[in-house]
Each structure stands twice: as structure tokens, then as C-alpha cells.
Amino acid sequence: MVKLFIGNLPREATEQEIRSLFEQYGKVLECDIIKNYGFVHIEDKTAAEDAIRNLHHYKLHGVNINVEASKNKSKASTKLHVGNISPTCTNQELRAKFEEYGPVIECDIVKDYAFVHMERAEDAVEAIRGLDNTEFQGKRMHVQLSTSRLRTAPGMGDQSGCYRCGKEGHWSKECPVDRTGRVADFTEQYNEQYGAVRTPYTMGYGESMYYNDAYGALDYYKRYRVRSYEAVAAAAAASAYNYAEQTMSHLPQVQSSAVPSHLNSTSVDPYDRHLLQNSGSAATSAAMAAAASSSYYGRDRSPLRRNAAVLPAVGEGYGYGPESEMSQASAATRNSLYDMARYEREQYVDRTRYSAF
């Protein structure tokens, strides 16, 4: 079947008149007139070519009509989305799989999914029922109606039906709209061809002549702006000083008599040392120093020699009675706590040693 377009029809023309005119060259299946143009469907292609050759610019009711093959757009198809496709699958294999349910207009594989355009909607529904969640080349594929609004019509060889914006006249790689739906920025492409684009000079912060104007516009957000560390520290120190002045201003300034007069001055040297007052003569000081040195350095510091004097000799044993207790008590007072521990431990050792006698 071939569809012919008839243009520039006169108002007096009727469908019966147009049908009888084209039946001279072949069988007419359908004839429709829409205002000043119409369509005629001829069964044979050769008959359609003869009708075009003989009836183009044919004068009908004083008007030359135009007869040519119809250049209508592609038939509306049903677009299917096929997911989870094997990486080894080809377009021919996938097309053959879907042609089992009806004519396939186009089949395109994109990575692990594909789009299949079927000519009839009822065939697409049958393909979904028969192929969804089925094994194909070792993987379970998912078939469903495509929800993409762009590129619903088949045809990828010409500059028609851009994937991104849906307009005609360019491919998707040349589309000014990016993948997010915004107009793309061609600054980089322009810079490569014509050099870098100079941006206008903008004045820096505070360079305006009216910036420091005391009677300028009010800054309503000044209280919310972040201040520098130095300003915050200075404000904190000032507030602390003012608080001390307000709270302690009514208290009298009392100077304690116990504090020496040389410590009340503000110029006190913490490293200044003062000699103790001389309470006696030089002879007294020398005697005190000699006593201190004799009591500390003159004493025998060896615990072994001190314990040897206190412990009883071998074979004498331990005595009992008040005299022995007093001697042990006097020895304990002469020794330190460390010496007492050593003495008791050595006494226990000696006791075990002389227990057989």
C-alpha cells in the first residue's frame, strides 16, 4: 500500500470525484479530503507511480492540484525497556527474540540494557508477558514499558529527535542542554577558539568610597557577623575589668600588718633573697653547726654494723626477763623504722638458726 498526498484541492472537489480520478491507474483502498488537501491509498506501488506521473499539476475545476508520495512521520511505536542484558548479546539476537511477538522497528543496546521499538502496542504487551523475568543468554532480563519521554520515535541516523531536549536539527552530543536539563556553558569551547574571556574587574571588599561613610546605609546584620579573635579577647578583658571595678569599688583597701612592708610594693622581686637575722654570736652559730653535722654525718649509717651490735652472739641464745626486754626496747628506739624491719627479719632468721639448741 502506498499513501499519496493531494494538495491545492478546490472547494468543489469531492471524495467520489477524487477516487474515480485515481482509480484509472490502480485500486484505491481509501480516500480522504481534509479542507484543501487529501490522502489517497493505492494498493500497488506501480499504480501509485503512474498516478503521480499523470495527475501531478492536473487541472481540476480550474485549479492545478499537486500529487506526490506522502512524507508522513514514522508510525508511532511502543518503546520497551529491556534490562539486565548479557554483555555478549548483539542487536540482531535481541531483535530476533522480540520479533517472535511482532514486527520490530528498531533495537538499540546501551551497555547492559536496551530499547526495543515495536510496531504495534498489542505485540509489545505480549512481549512483556512472554519475556519479562525470563532467561536469555544466561541472564534473567526484565522487560517493561519505557518511561522515557524523549526519543519515543525510532530513527537514530539523522539529526532528528534529540535525546536531551527533544528538538530536531542536532544530535544529542551537540545539544546545548546538559544531562541535568540546564543550558550548557560554552565558555571553555569559546576560550579554545578565541582565547580566554576576560572577566570584568570588580572592586574588593571595602574599596568603595562610601564604605567608611559614617552616614551610609545601616548594617542590620552587624550583630550576627563573626568578630576576630583579637577583638573578642579585648572585649572579654574589658568586661572582666569593669566587673571587678563595679563589684569591689565599695570595699575599703585594708593592708594587713602581717605582710611585710617590702612585699606590699608593686616592684617585688620574686627571686630576691634576704639573710636571716643574727640572733647570737659567731661561737653559738658554730656550735649549732657542729652539733648538726655530728648528729647527721657522725652517726654510723650502716645497718649491718648497727644490727651486729644489737643481735646476741652465737651460742648465747635469747634471754628472758625484764633486763632483756629493756635492752630490746632501747635498741628499737635507737633504730629507725627501716632498721626495725631489718632487725625483726634478722631476728627471725637467727631464731630459726638457734631453734635446735
From Swiss-Prot:
<dbReference type="GO" id="GO:0006397">
    <property type="term" value="P:mRNA processing"/>
</dbReference>
<dbReference type="GO" id="GO:0005829">
    <property type="term" value="C:cytosol"/>
</dbReference>
<feature type="domain" description="RRM 1">
    <location>
        <begin position="2"/>
        <end position="72"/>
    </location>
</feature>
<comment type="subunit">
    <text>Interacts with TNPO3, which may mediate nuclear import of the protein.</text>
</comment>
<keyword id="KW-0694">RNA-binding</keyword>
<dbReference type="GO" id="GO:0032991">
    <property type="term" value="C:protein-containing complex"/>
</dbReference>
<keyword id="KW-0863">Zinc-finger</keyword>
<dbReference type="InterPro" id="IPR034898">
    <property type="entry name" value="RBM4_RRM2"/>
</dbReference>
<dbReference type="InterPro" id="IPR012677">
    <property type="entry name" value="Nucleotide-bd_a/b_plait_sf"/>
</dbReference>
<keyword id="KW-0010">Activator</keyword>
<protein>
    <recommendedName>
        <fullName>RNA-binding protein 4B</fullName>
    </recommendedName>
</protein>
<dbReference type="GO" id="GO:0032922">
    <property type="term" value="P:circadian regulation of gene expression"/>
</dbReference>
<keyword id="KW-0507">mRNA processing</keyword>
<keyword id="KW-0677">Repeat</keyword>
<dbReference type="GO" id="GO:0005730">
    <property type="term" value="C:nucleolus"/>
</dbReference>
<feature type="region of interest" description="Interaction with TNPO3">
    <location>
        <begin position="196"/>
        <end position="357"/>
    </location>
</feature>
<dbReference type="GO" id="GO:0006417">
    <property type="term" value="P:regulation of translation"/>
</dbReference>
<feature type="domain" description="RRM 2">
    <location>
        <begin position="78"/>
        <end position="148"/>
    </location>
</feature>
<dbReference type="InterPro" id="IPR050502">
    <property type="entry name" value="Euk_RNA-bind_prot"/>
</dbReference>
<keyword id="KW-0862">Zinc</keyword>
<dbReference type="GO" id="GO:0010628">
    <property type="term" value="P:positive regulation of gene expression"/>
</dbReference>
<dbReference type="GO" id="GO:0007623">
    <property type="term" value="P:circadian rhythm"/>
</dbReference>
<keyword id="KW-0479">Metal-binding</keyword>
<dbReference type="GO" id="GO:0005654">
    <property type="term" value="C:nucleoplasm"/>
</dbReference>
<dbReference type="GO" id="GO:0008380">
    <property type="term" value="P:RNA splicing"/>
</dbReference>
<dbReference type="InterPro" id="IPR035979">
    <property type="entry name" value="RBD_domain_sf"/>
</dbReference>
<dbReference type="InterPro" id="IPR000504">
    <property type="entry name" value="RRM_dom"/>
</dbReference>
<dbReference type="GO" id="GO:0008270">
    <property type="term" value="F:zinc ion binding"/>
</dbReference>
<dbReference type="Pfam" id="PF00076">
    <property type="entry name" value="RRM_1"/>
</dbReference>
<comment type="function">
    <text>Required for the translational activation of PER1 mRNA in response to circadian clock. Binds directly to the 3'-UTR of the PER1 mRNA.</text>
</comment>
<dbReference type="GO" id="GO:0043153">
    <property type="term" value="P:entrainment of circadian clock by photoperiod"/>
</dbReference>
<dbReference type="GO" id="GO:0003723">
    <property type="term" value="F:RNA binding"/>
</dbReference>
<dbReference type="InterPro" id="IPR001878">
    <property type="entry name" value="Znf_CCHC"/>
</dbReference>
<dbReference type="InterPro" id="IPR034897">
    <property type="entry name" value="RBM4_RRM1"/>
</dbReference>
<dbReference type="Pfam" id="PF00098">
    <property type="entry name" value="zf-CCHC"/>
</dbReference>
<keyword id="KW-0539">Nucleus</keyword>
<feature type="zinc finger region" description="CCHC-type">
    <location>
        <begin position="160"/>
        <end position="177"/>
    </location>
</feature>
<keyword id="KW-0508">mRNA splicing</keyword>
